[in-house]
């Protein structure tokens, strides 16, 4: 494909050609993408409303409602920001984990259908990570054709592998963080950089938020990877890490590794690269000494720059955690804001971010879906 060009394509369905669709390529020297968090179609199944007679919605109604809201989010985002060239998600496109159980797989497929039914996606490319709700079945691979899959991954999940791609002068490295073997992620990052040595911007996309501010994950299982990935990102000059998982918004200061050795808590890793959440959660809740030790080990970072607005040639990595793009599920913020957090928000409404990249700048703005109003102040990194 050539930059700044319009293409058309058609799909043949049941022997009939469908209506032609339009696809426009962007400007590699000045492009924008939409960053949306945890659409998680079907996750509202526990909610109650008049339609469900005060009972839980159930999977069918939840998938329908969440799909409708997903479509609204994408339509409003494109209306408000027609400059968007593609979409990035940190994972959890669906809610049912689909652990190869026939009933679960059927429900998961219904949710994928809802996710992919959004009309905007006929014309907008997307690059999505594998979330913890996506990782347990091969269904993800049936719906997304990812470039440059990291087949050398030693402990992939059933959903597949990490991958990478470039757009303009930016290299995007998409990690399957449900694999808790950090050596795999290190190898993927190094391979992607080796094949794209001239990329000015190095961006990692992953599901688990190792520097978030949500109550559900940011102080417990969500940071089990922090001690391992922080020095890897630092050593490979990663500029930005885009995260999800905590269904709340958070933006960090510029962070570096403290350069010290920290416990990797190997006893909670599973053979296939996963994480034993039940054993960890039980000990974390009941054992105060362990909880204090765990939190102390996760102080594995330094705050390199607290500047706001526009920062020029900053040290360290910038981490952004997205809130829910559909409103299917939200989490509270952790009561005490962590020292690495520059800004955070939970207004219980769907949101999305628009990220613009030029030859010299990376700028993020985050918006309320319904009103289009800015949720957080603009943040720009300039590299000269």
Name the predicted role of every residue range.
Residues 170-171, 206-210, 335-378:
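Extracellular low-complexity, Gly/Ser/Thr-rich intrinsically disordered linkers
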Residues 90-97, 196-216:
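Short acidic, glycine-rich surface-loop motifs adjacent to enzyme active sites
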Residues 35, 89, 166-167, 357-359, ...:
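Generic beta-strand structural signal
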Residues 35-37, 86-92, 126-132, 175-176, ...:
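Active-site neighborhood of phospho(di)ester-bond hydrolases with catalytic His/Asp-centered motifs
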Residues 110-118, 224-246, 349-350:
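Catalytic-core region of carbohydrate-active enzymes that cleave or remodel glycosidic bonds
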Residues 6-22, 48, 55-60, 99-202, ...:
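Extended active-site neighborhood of metal-dependent phosphoesterases/phosphodiesterases
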Residues 43, 95-97, 135-137, 181-182, ...:
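Flexible loop/turn segments at secondary-structure boundaries
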Residues 3-6, 10-101:
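N-terminal active-site segment of His-dependent metallophosphoesterases
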């Amino acid at each position: 494909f050539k930059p700044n060009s319009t293409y058309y394509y058609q799909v043949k369905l049941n022997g009939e050609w469908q209506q032609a669709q339009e696809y426009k390529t962007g400007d590699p020297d000045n492009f924008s993408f939409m960053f949306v968090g945890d659409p998680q179609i079907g996750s509202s199944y526990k909610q109650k409303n008049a339609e469900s007679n005060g009972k839980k919605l159930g999977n069918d109604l939840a998938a329908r409602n969440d799909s409708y809201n997903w479509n609204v989010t994408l339509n409003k985002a494109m209306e408000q920001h027609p400059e968007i060239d593609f979409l990035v998600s940190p994972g959890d496109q669906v809610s049912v984990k689909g652990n190869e159980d026939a009933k679960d797989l059927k429900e998961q497929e219904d949710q994928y259908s809802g996710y992919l039914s959004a009309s905007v996606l006929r014309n907008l490319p997307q690059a999505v990570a594998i979330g913890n709700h996506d990782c347990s079945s091969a269904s993800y691979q049936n719906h997304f054709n990812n470039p440059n899959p990291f087949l050398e991954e030693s402990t992939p999940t059933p959903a597949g592998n990490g991958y990478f791609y470039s757009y303009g002068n930016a290299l995007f490295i998409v990690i399957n963080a449900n694999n808790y073997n950090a050596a795999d992620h290190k190898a993927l990052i190094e391979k992607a950089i080796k094949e794209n040595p001239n990329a000015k911007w190095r961006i990692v996309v992953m599901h688990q938020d190792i520097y978030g501010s949500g109550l559900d994950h940011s102080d417990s299982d969500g940071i089990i990877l922090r001690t391992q990935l922080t020095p890897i990102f630092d050593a490979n000059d990663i500029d930005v890490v885009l995260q999800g998982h905590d269904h709340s918004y958070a933006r960090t200061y510029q962070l570096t590794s403290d350069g010290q050795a920290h416990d990797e808590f190997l006893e909670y890793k599973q053979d296939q690269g996963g994480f034993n959440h039940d054993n960890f959660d039980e000990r974390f809740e009941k054992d105060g000494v362990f909880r204090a030790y765990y939190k102390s080990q996760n102080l594995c970072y330094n705050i390199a720059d607290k500047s706001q607005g526009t920062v020029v040639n900053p040290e360290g990595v910038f981490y952004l955690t997205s809130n829910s793009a559909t409103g299917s599920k939200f989490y509270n913020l952790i009561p005490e804001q962590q020292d690495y957090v520059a800004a955070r928000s939970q207004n219980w409404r769907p949101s999305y971010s628009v990220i613009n990249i030029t030859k010299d700048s990376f700028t993020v703005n985050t918006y309320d879906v319904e009103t289009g109003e800015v949720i957080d102040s603009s943040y720009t990194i300039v590299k000269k």
